[in-house]
């Protein structure tokens, strides 16, 4: 029984030392109590992530956007669609009107070289 308890203690000690060695190899000592040679930055990664998300999503920082009137936005969107359709119709109608105006105001000219016209 004494042999079994001794081997169990040595086995646990070996397991603990191997895990400590593996953690220190990965860059973070297992048994350190927080007093490190190089102290951590002011904000840890766990603190930086929510702060970054809040900064990138300005809706959380500005409570004035919380009461946006949704029906007015829908009406603005409808007006913009109508304006876009009107613009596209006007844009497609412009070249045909321009060609009609050019043909009526200027007679067709023949190609001439010096005094010989074709």
Curated annotation (Swiss-Prot):
Expression by tissue, per the entry, reads:
Expressed in a number of tissues includinf brain, thymus, spleen, testis and spinal cord.
Would you indicate the residue range of the signal peptide? Answer: 1-27
Q: What family does this belong to? A: Belongs to the urotensin-2 family.
InterPro entries to which the protein is assigned, alphabetical: U-IIB (IPR043255), Urotensin_II (IPR001483)
Q: What is this protein called?
A: Urotensin-2B
Q: Per its record, what are the GO molecular function terms? A: G protein-coupled receptor binding; hormone activity
Q: Where in the cell is it found?
A: Secreted
What is this protein's function? Potent vasoconstrictor.
Listed A to Z, the keywords are: Cleavage on pair of basic residues, Disulfide bond, Hormone, Secreted, Signal
Entry GO CC? extracellular region
Chain residues in the propeptide: 28-108
Predominant location: secreted
Q: Which GO terms describe its biological process?
A: blood vessel diameter maintenance; regulation of blood pressure
Can you list the disulfide-bonded cysteine pairs?
A: 112-117
